[in-house]
Amino acid sequence: MDKQWFPAAGILLAALLVVSASTLTLLSTNEDPEQFPSAPGTSAQQSSRILLGILTDVTGGINSVEREPEALGRRAGGLSTEGAGGQESPSMPGPSGRVIPEPIPSALTTSASDMASQPVSSGADPIEEIMALGTLETITMSSPQPSPRHESEQKFDKVFRLCGTVPASETLEKNVASKPAWHLIKAPPPPIFSRSPHLLWCTPNSTVYIPVPAWRDGHSRPEASSSVPLAPSTSLGLPIFPWMPNILKATESLLPASPGRSGLDLTSQVGSRASENTVALDTGPVSRGTSVLLLPSATSPSQASSLHSPRPSSASPLSASPSPAALSFFPSPASILVLVSSVTTGASDSPKAPVSVIAPSTTDSFIKTSNLGPQIALQPSHPGLWLPTSPIHMPTLSLQHFSSPPSTAHSSGFTESSVHADPTLASTLPHPGQDMSLQDLSFSTGGRSHTTHSVTFRINSNRFTKAVWNLVPLERWLLNRLICYQLRFIYQEAFPNFRNVSTLLFRPGCPEVKASLIFGPPDPSSIEILWTLYRKVKSSRWSLGYLSLADHGLSSAGYSMTDLTQEIINISFTLMRPFLPQLLLPSSQSCILLEKQTIQLVTHEVSRFYKAELQSQPLLLFSNVKEWVSVYMEYKFKSPIPIRLQGLASHLAHHITDPTLQKSSIMANGEKADLVFYEMWLLILGHPFTKTLENKTSSECQELRGLLTRQLTSVLQPLKNFGQVVVEEFHQEPLTARVQTAFFGAVPAQAIIQDTVLQALGSLQETEGLQLEMLLPVLGTPSSRASRGPRGGAMLNLQRFTSLFVLVALCTAPPFINKQALYLS
């Protein structure tokens, strides 16, 4: 009794499916043949074939129950012929010629096929499919574009199916803006891989958004979604993710199709440390605009599981449909990966698609990594670091590998190869000793109006070499983006004709990085490019972002730091103003303001001394020297100059009149100004000593120093060859001030200096109420003649007479008048 109604139920179900398929076929005939169905699964005509395949499976199941395979098989064959309009069923024949029914499709397959079979008008908006993830059996189909004349003659070239298992609690959304044609994917009935493989979607070269749930240790993250925009005009449309194995690219032309088989037969294996799953691609003719997108596995805890990227408002329609392809998974200990993609050039006579191949490595070779530019944010599946869910602009990497370097070698020891390598070269896997680079294909070829220059620098980090050798870890992605961003920022600010950073070349086991820069006309010189990077890196305390660089590893196209030092001058001096910690931050307001003032103060005099035009902005550094601001500057000129010309320090000391610049501290190209110093100690009576006077940054110290400096300068300035008065410091018990007076060349007689200073001290007592006594004058040696001894016994010992002068001053001083001293800020 339980089995008697099965034939009737099967017949009713078959009739219902045939009616639905016939209706959909009739509706699809009214559509424009040039339009592709918007569903990512199938077209309307292909949906009928899928339904007929499902019908065959259901009928086969009923046959096994009722033990009537022959009768029901003939009935199902008749229904298939009637519903498809004379077209063949996609069922696979067995060895004996008998149709072998496939396993009954899951609910996901049936629902996806039903949804994909709905007719879509040419002006309809992109639809959104929501498929619950259970035991996933994804079926996609593709056939040549239907022709209105020979529609009944169309057949499948190749069909296949990909089976995979993902958690049933997750949700997979696919938003497809264009209308591509899809391939039928079939897999061998017995799954022979040990764990769930990565889902492989064969998509046209358009913007496809595939939100994928993020898995971490078996826990789901429903909010994690992704969209992967595929670049429409790149030489290789293969996004590479951190969980993927080492992927190397060798550009090859497709082989001609063999008789009885359409397209190229490529069988290869893929493997890594974490997995020995293998992918074999069996493709037909690859059309333009086709790319392969690999999605992460749901069960691999060591692989990244989601991508994040904002969705654009619209997507461009497709220009070509993808070609059939076949996939199969099988394990193998030794593995290589073959990825097939096509080049989208936009021209009708575009070359054939390149083939990416990996093979075991046996020789030293050179690797390039291409930065294709889609916006991708990675989220690792392993415990620990989690990235924010907000999008991050990350490059899509593919590796380019060449077994032999070019004939020309660079001075830095790097070797470079063209983006389009010789297809006859054997590709090998990387190993220590190879060179590897990241390449941005948007400007990989400069063209006639562009030129390429290179710069090399060293990174002071032991972790750097370890991160670089792992070909596709997250650290490499972040490192690539950081370096490219910093270099673009530096050169875009200095050169309006700068275009892009095309290549980053890494040497495993070595901290050197070589960057290729693209410039438009006019072409800058290599020494200018080196100077620009040197100025920015040194002004940032030898850092590039958060990377610390070595101070001896910069070079550009054969020019090293030794060559650069031949064309620059350096100047250092001290500004007698309190040092602020903000001056160590180049972007702080205090640093920007002081930098502007200093450049205006010095640049004009430097240009006037050499009578030459300077190269852009100088290098400027601030540091702390005894609580004052120490300034270090470097200038480069646009034309060669006699940089060893002496006298620049004396020229600056004569012509810079800013009282805050300490003339005795000026040094240019290792040369000091030609000055002679007259030093004296002043005893300050009636003024209490406080600890704040020992701090040069305190307001009390600055007020008292300013008062003494102005008063002494006013009385000493009329003297011949007067240079500057500097109150160096204050000492306690008793309160004394050390004062240094600088003169250019010959110094006036000591008696004249003492008389002039005594006049200034009397004036201070009358105007400010300060009583000062000059303890001991000391005549020093010229700063530019340090080897010369003191003049004629003029150097006296201060320690011997200090107590005597203090005693005399205290005994002979008049009664102290309590009067508030007026301090000038």
Curated annotation (Swiss-Prot):
Give residue spans, biased composition: Low complexity: 302-322
Tissue expression from the record: Expression is restricted to circumvallate papillae.
Q: Keyword Signal on this protein?
A: yes
What are the leading ranks of the lineage? Eukaryota, Metazoa, Chordata, Craniata, Vertebrata
The residue stretches assigned to a coiled coil in this entry are: none
Please verify whether the record's keywords include Cell cycle: no
Organism the protein comes from: Mus musculus (Mouse)
- Keywords tagged on the record: Signal
**Signal peptide coordinates:** 1-21
Report which superkingdom the organism of origin falls in.
Eukaryota
The ranges of region (Disordered) come to 66-97, 299-322
Q: What is this protein called?
A: Taste receptor cell protein 1
